[in-house]
Amino acid sequence: MERVQDPVTKWCVLIEETVGRGESQRWGVSEISKFDTRDEALAAAEQAVREYQPQHPTFAKGRDAYQVGEDSWIVWVPGATREYHFRVSVGKQV
């Protein structure tokens, strides 16, 4: 069954990750992309899970992705000296 799209609702893909350098490193939203439909947002989120290049680590040695909800994923990225992760989520702007 196809969902009826609310013409006012904007669907978003949000990426949360470690941002900044040194003492100013923090967990934050680094990117928000907006879409007209949930299906478009889900497709973009799934692509980000596979292809997004996080700020840390600089030299990623791979990635393991875990779907933790219907619309959210955690991606584990080992680097040369530390391991990082980022989260990709689909939401709607309210």
Predicted regions mapped to residue ranges:
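Short aromatic-glycine-(Arg/Gly/Cys) micro-motifs in beta-strand/loop hairpins
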Residues: E2-S30
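Intrinsically disordered, low-complexity regulatory segments enriched
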Residues: E16, I32, P78-T81
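A short, exposed loop/beta-hairpin motif centered on an aromatic-Gly-Thr core
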Residues: R26-E40
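Short, surface-exposed linear segments at secondary-structure transitions and domain or protein termini
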Residues: D36-A43, K92-V94
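Acidic, metal/cofactor-coordinating or nucleic-acid-engaging core segments within structured domains
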Residues: L42, E46, P57
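Short, mixed-charge low-complexity intrinsically disordered segments
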Residues: R50-V94
